[in-house]
Curated annotation (Swiss-Prot):
Lineage of the species this protein comes from: Eukaryota, Viridiplantae, Streptophyta, Embryophyta, Tracheophyta
Gene: rpoA
Protein name: DNA-directed RNA polymerase subunit alpha
Molecular function terms, GO-annotated: DNA binding; DNA-directed RNA polymerase activity; protein dimerization activity
Matches recorded under SUPFAM superfamilies: C-terminal domain of RNA polymerase alpha subunit, Insert subdomain of RNA polymerase alpha subunit, RBP11-like subunits of RNA polymerase
Similarity field: Belongs to the RNA polymerase alpha chain family.
Length: 337
């Protein structure tokens, strides 16, 4: 466990981690402070951040099991101690970490007798298990235990519905939330009009993300939500005669690029996030895993740097170069200077 003495800055607003610990492979804890804040700001930020931590961060789960030998979810199989329903519940608890986009397939094929655990899951290379010891089933006889799995990356909850049931395929209620819990508290100091606040934020995660990673992801998601309001056309800010609404033009990546070309000084490159571009989601996820979130981050890398990214291909670099050349009339350096 790591603890740091809390010191309050009287100048620049800043985040700081004051405590972090790993309780288990599936439970991480972090405590952060943000200061100095004006009166009322801590609650505003704390509420928004807690919502983003619990609802906006994506996670990876097993969402479906496939086996033609299982008649129904509540049946039992000779040679297996657990019922099918119990096995599904155990698979629901498996914690995965990935840069997967959408769905992917995995499988388990084990011969008994013995215990089946998370380490027996055969996964694609871009998915990893947080805790290999998680129990799935106990095989009491020399039988073959072979099932297919569907893995999905999403956010929030996925509740199985009747139309999701297929012959030999069983959906699992999935909880995609990497953050188990988040709380915020406020400490006030100072007197009168000079009163200020410190925001304390506590984050518990399931091990697929660290609290610091979760905080970064939630912050970026909040920024993405608010950017459209910063860059809408000025003409749309004023009501015309006989109008009772303010028309907001649809926010697109291309609109922002066009405005940047006209006057690069007005919009910082760091305010353009790559997930708003026309890049395929697979390319975006690869960039994100390398901490490339904005156009500024991208331009700070060479073609050679991009080719070193895991699962990145030459076609992906060409796709990025095409966008940069089309909308910025610039090229990405082949090598670092």
């Amino acid at each position: 466990m790591v603890r740091e003495k809390v010191t309050v800055s009287t100048r620049t607003l800043q985040w700081k981690c004051v405590e972090s610990r790993t309780d288990s492979k599936r439970l991480y804890y972090g405590r952060f402070i943000l200061s100095p804040l004006m009166k009322g700001q801590a609650d505003t930020i704390g509420i928004a951040m807690r919502r983003a931590l619990l609802g906006e961060i994506e996670g990876t789960c097993i969402t479906r099991v496939k086996s033609e030998k299982v008649p129904h979810e509540y049946s039992t199989i000779t040679g297996i101690q657990e019922s099918v329903h119990e096995i599904l519940m155990n698979l629901k608890e498996i914690i995965l970490r990935s840069n997967l986009y959408g769905t992917s397939d995995a499988s388990i094929c084990v011969k008994g007798p013995g215990s089946v655990t998370a380490q027996d899951i055969i996964l694609p290379p871009y998915v990893e298990i947080v805790d290999n010891t998680q129990h799935i089933a106990s095989l009491t006889e020399p039988i073959d235990f072979c099932i297919g799995l569907q893995i999905e990356r999403n956010r929030g909850y996925l509740i199985k519905t009747p139309h999701n049931f297929q012959d030999g395929s069983y959906p699992i209620d999935a909880v995609f939330m990497p953050v188990r819990n988040a709380n915020h508290s406020i400490h006030s100091y100072g007197n009168g009009n000079e009163k200020q606040e410190i925001l304390f934020l506590e984050i518990w995660t399931n091990g697929s993300l660290t609290p610091k990673e979760a905080l970064h992801e939630a912050s970026r998601n909040l920024i993405d939500l608010f950017i459209p309001f910063l860059h809408m056309e000025e003409d749309n800010l004023y009501l015309q005669d006989n109008q009772h609404t303010v028309p907001l033009s649809p926010f697109t990546f291309h609109d922002k690029l066009a405005k940047l070309i006209k006057n690069k000084k007005k919009i910082a490159l760091k305010s353009i996030f790559i997930d708003q571009s026309e890049l395929p989601s697979r390319i975006y996820n690869c960039l994100k895993m390398s901490n490339i979130y904005t156009l500024l981050d991208l331009l700070n890398n060479s073609q050679e740097d991009l080719m070193k990214i895991e699962h990145f291909r030459s076609e992906d670099v060409k796709r990025i170069l095409g966008i940069l050349e089309k909308y910025f009339v610039i090229d990405l350096a082949k090598n670092k200077f």
